[in-house]
């Protein structure tokens, strides 16, 4: 036997892997076990796996049955046990067996001995997971068989996995032969035995048997003991035998080292010798809940972590490129769940309910003031006061004044984070913090990193100090050099808060600051971002304080013998050596902090210095009195010479804390003179800060009594300054001074000084409010302004004694007294002074206290000013108060001049040598005047838009958007260099520029409208002026004559009437110019080969007035010339310019400007007269000539005839039938949207021979562009016309938006813009869209979707301006209307909500609710406007005249022609259309399904008899919030009246308060469940004139209505109810009655309904005669789903039914 075994050779493993596991590579051996060899390898995707190999040296032994059984067990627990890692692959060959599982770096054995060591909370969390894992395995019938610390895997976030299931190993082992145990179980050769004692049996009893759960429980108990003891394992093999035989091994004494008695008892029970006495894993979990394991493990943390980290994901690892997003989403999820005001389990676990009110200490910035903190966090004030009061009570301040707001100091902010928390907080932090730390180095977005750092601040409050420094700090330090400044700032604040709460340290952290923190923080001194340096300046004092604290703790450790000395020869404690080391460390620390502070004090940014000033107190404590005087004070004095008033203000705000440390002498020598001079600072905020500092220093008794008296004399006049803050601060100084004296001094010194300023005698001053009531009031602003003018304008004045031009040397400098007399004044020019303040004791010049008006000496000039002041209400006896303010007025004026001079000097330093050559040659670049046709430009810009133009995110100012952007011919322009010097092109002079640009108008009389136009467009770059494009413009080189009115600046102001971006702007009447005769225009039009040129109208663009152009008001012209031969152009490509160089930067810039201008161009064509502007003509029954057709005069009102004249059927909705119909603005054609993705434009054509015969012709059709890989087009779901133009926007089901300019007569269309709504799910289709014109003339599109998203798009750039989610609880959005100017949009939903959305700010402004589903909405025009007899050009969205389609002169009897040959145009009054669009009245059609049996209805089935659809229309004024009229049909009297009721929007901000139907939140599937009826109620407003057409009459709206599910249409006349009639059923009998008066509610009840009649004697022509056989049966009626009204040539009602058929009715 032995000889045979010795001849078997073990194969080479790399050969085995290459032959049998070719998908794995890069093997690394992880051990030389005798039983299973372990290798770490990688698969083809790069993921690490662990492979266990058993080499079968005896081929006759089959391993298939064993491996198959193991495979079944692993498949049973795969993805079902979160705490188990099964084998993902098993393979058996003739040579070996392979077990493959995912590789995890650490196991429990390694983690126990790795720093930072596990805390008790983390150990309990791991124990809980292992019990849960083994319980799940046992429940599935799987036992492990070999549980030990090496077979328990631990991730970086402390998630535990049971791995290496060993059910294939023998269950029982011989107790007299340890070789079997060593071969199968002791793979690490540690001689550790966790095998249950019952598994060791005599050799005679060895037999195969299954594993039992009790065996795993014993092994798990051994692992628990090893985890808690952290020393040696619980059992070796010999100790286990002794324990089994009741030998000398005392288990209880070993487990007594565990402090928790409950944990001891649990482990003793698990290690019971009798297997029957051991409980199941689930029983242990239930028994020790609340004792060993906290309840939060069961209720919250375990399930939350499973959903967060997806433990089963280890079996199917994510792609490497998804790792960052995976970790980022994990961080963001935790942040959203923990941060208040969430009310979920995790948030409640980590925060005591209602303790913080949404504010926590981690949100308190270290470098902001208290006011800024309160403004950002409205609820913070009460929270801060409550915490501050709590801390003060702990410190013994019981008599703290209630309601006061203490200033936040860094020490207070430190203490806020140290609030005690309960046990749940500790366990929550122990579980969640490792998850955050494990992902913090893998996230790549700024938001996720900042969220992670915020979570670290929250969770680290609940862990021990050692974990803060050993576990958390290294992870946060990695973000100190992040690329984002916000992340670096957050990391620095996190580190500061982390170390500031440490109270005890381990010996390893004794030199943390000197060796670790400060070397890494040093780079913040030179960070490029000033905010980062400012943050470090605010954190440095706290870090210095903690560094000193750590130094003291290290000294204590040395004295205790815990921390050894650096030198090895000092074996015993040497206190002298320890003291020396302490002083050396202290000196090194001070030198380091001093270097950092000196750098920050001299920083160039005032923000950095202000941040350091806000935290001076800790630095003064750190440095001591001497160092504070030498280092800090010497730098701070220079701050007062800075022009930044906020820096000076911060200096005086911090001076009180600094004065405590430098002492009274330094205050008297250095601080007091500076404060006195600051009393005349020109900035009121600085004066307020100085007065506040005076008050604080007086309260601290840092001034002598005589100094306080002098300060009081200076401050008293300031109570009259017209500034409430200064007055309040001055009163505070007076009150503090009064309280600092005893009673005798008050009566003898203070009261005489106060008495002149008091309006009545005051016995005692016990409050500021009382002092404010009795002291003189402030002077008015007008008086103060007059006083200032008096000083500035008076020449010979006795009132102003000192020379007004006196410089700063006029201030008396005296070392003997504080208030000295005026000395000899020396005149100096202000510009010669570089300093605002001096550093010596000073007194205000000419300071003389005046207590009565008689002491004043006034000249004649002074008397005039005094009389003016008297007339303003100032009593004569109080003029002395103004006299005491003379010094304040004079010195503030002088100081202000000095500061302004310094600011100007700083600017001049940038250009010290203005005449020095810069060696930069300015170059003027011209655009080539030869431009391609508009169609090619449109195609080119469309192709370039997605590739380049959309990637340019260039912000423009409002005025820049007003400049024309249409392609146009461009000539020379001026160029401004970087220093503001305007240069002219040398080769082209301004006098050489002349252009002739004409345009032929489309008006009937052939009148040509032309004008001048600015050919320049100011870009964002001030150095270059670029042309704005107009595709239809061209330079006429034959007749170089054109107007060129210029403004004072030499530039040209333009107004392009073809520009869609200038719709709402007004021309100044004097600036409108018309030139060139019609003959020249005709000639030029021929030379241009039919290209109509845009009229060039030069004017100033008014940015305030939004009215449209009413017409041409001036015909004056100015001419200039241009020599096109001098223009150098490039001929290589479309992006042509005069630039001939090859500089790639210049070329890229020109390409960017060209692409941006082309992308923003949207030529929607000329505007047309809207059809509602004319009366509704009657249908002609007799033959009339075409000429007579133009002279039709209406003699009576229109009424529907009830005749169907045509029908269009393209197949069912599945085959491409009609879904929606829209009429062009002038009713010359209509557009149908098909379910096959095709848009078709139709015209009505009638025969001249047979007037009563009519047919429809499809003039053009086009389909939406297919995306790559798509065979069929998506259905076109919605569309709209862009203003009164032929530009049509449509959207498909996948969110693709296209804008086409339709030319129906020529059967052409042009794609002018295209895009796609982002993040639109296929099931979230567009339900409504509406276009409107913005204030700058650009066209905007508002789209709402089924899932209640509102998308706001710029049609020209085709980019999303905003995309917001409406409240899902309101239901699905069904319709939207948009106001003129795109200020607001009104959205209707399926649950009856009217949401008024502010498009400017993207917020919900107001809401109303009505008990019905809102189906359609229309913005009604202003019907009060009357017709005018004056012809007018009504401007469209591009400000061009109305296009009147000329009539046809054909009289052939056999010819057919478009019906739009006769369109009567009724002009409106000036700007009538704009005023109409300004209306706020909306017609709302609604429907509701009444459920009599309270049963649900399947909308796909027929509506049962117990359900009835009720519908109606309500006219609602959005501005007033009032209902004007209501129309109801089949309305149940038991239903609530459908009148919109206002609902506050506050409920939308709180998730729990917004459950309309029930108390539960609703998801997307519940959007359409309340008021859904099978079919919508369709309506369309119709406008007609009352009475005869002659004269000035009013228009009135009629409403075309199709009730919900009805096949018939009805006309409702709210002005004459009896005139209401049916359109499609003339035999219908119905009644309509008024049931309410306020508002009027009309109810229609049908008594009889017949089927729609057949064609009334007229033939029914179709789209294609070949499709006649596909017509649906006439007797089969379908509900109406859409309607429209065609005004011309006479009234036609377009009806779309649910089958996809379109019918035309008169």
UniProtKB/Swiss-Prot annotation:
The modification Phosphoserine is found at residue 957. Residues 1056-1069 have a biased composition (Low complexity). Residues 1029-1055, 1431-1442 have a biased composition (Polar residues). Residues 24-293 form the Protein kinase domain. SUPFAM superfamilies: ARM repeat, Protein kinase-like (PK-like), WD40 repeat-like. Residues 984-1002, 1014-1023, 1079-1090 have a biased composition (Basic and acidic residues). Residues 982-1099, 1431-1461 are annotated as: Disordered. It catalyses: L-seryl-[protein] + ATP = O-phospho-L-seryl-[protein] + ADP + H(+); L-threonyl-[protein] + ATP = O-phospho-L-threonyl-[protein] + ADP + H(+). GO terms for biological process: late endosome to vacuole transport; macroautophagy; pexophagy; protein targeting to vacuole; retrograde transport, endosome to Golgi; signaling. One of its GO terms (cellular component) is phosphatidylinositol 3-kinase complex, class III, type I. Its EC number is 2.7.11.1. The active site is at 146 (proton acceptor). PROSITE patterns: HEAT_REPEAT, PROTEIN_KINASE_DOM, PROTEIN_KINASE_ST. SMART domains: S_TKc. ATP binds at residues 30-38, 52. Pfam families: Pkinase (PF00069), VPS15-like_hel (PF22956). It comes from the Eukaryota. Keywords: ATP-binding, Autophagy, Kinase, Nucleotide-binding, Phosphoprotein, Repeat, Serine/threonine-protein kinase, Transferase, WD repeat. Disulfide bonds: none annotated. The modification Phosphotyrosine is found at residue 958. WD repeats lie at residues 1213-1252, 1368-1407, 1577-1622. Functions as a part of the autophagy-specific VPS34 PI3-kinase complex I that plays a role in autophagosome assembly. This complex is essential to recruit the atg8-phosphatidylinositol conjugate and the atg12-atg5 conjugate to the pre-autophagosomal structure. Also functions as part of the VPS34 PI3-kinase complex II. PANTHER family: PHOSPHOINOSITIDE 3-KINASE REGULATORY SUBUNIT 4. Belongs to the protein kinase superfamily. Ser/Thr protein kinase family. Component of the autophagy-specific vps34 PI3-kinase complex I composed of vps15, atg6, pik3/vps34, atg14 and atg38. Also a component of the vps34 PI3-kinase complex II composed of atg6, pik3, vps15 and vps38. This is Serine/threonine-protein kinase vps15. It comes from Schizosaccharomyces pombe (strain 972 / ATCC 24843) (Fission yeast). The lineage of its organism: Eukaryota, Fungi, Dikarya, Ascomycota, Taphrinomycotina.
